[in-house]
């Protein structure tokens, strides 16, 4: 399925989940894989819990002729591409906050200041990775006038990749030095 087609489904069902145990009615379930789990194995459960569609990348989990299973090449890539596609529908500034320490505090303070004049979408908690950033971007709505996205990294090149997903606008680098953090 092409991203534009997946986006049409998303517009009809604008809630995304990656946890089959917490499926809001009508949500899109993205069957992500981890080191110790395969989300594809939980696709049927997600549909039973009320998800409208299950996005899977292993054909054996797309049960029978059930059209609620959407087979893609890579579930994580589909989630990231969907978020990028969705983000591009909005002509608002997106501020990226990154750094070794202090990202979450800086993001929270930036969002608080901006909320005095704007309707701000911002990363909840520290959902700042290759899964959390796309999920946050998929919360963008026409009511938002600016977004503050926290990005973290656990491997080289991840910040650049996350910036590409959200479409580069502004970047705030936050560096905090202390005796506990001699990283710079």
Task: For the regions a language model picked out, list residue spans one by one.
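N-terminal leader/targeting and accessory segments in enzymes
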Residues: 1-81, 85
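Short linear motifs at secondary-structure transitions and domain/linker junctions
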Residues: 3-9, 29-31, 43-48, 70-73, ...
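Short, structured coil segments at secondary-structure junctions
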Residues: 50, 64-66, 116, 166, ...
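Phosphate-binding loop of NTP-binding sites
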Residues: 77-177
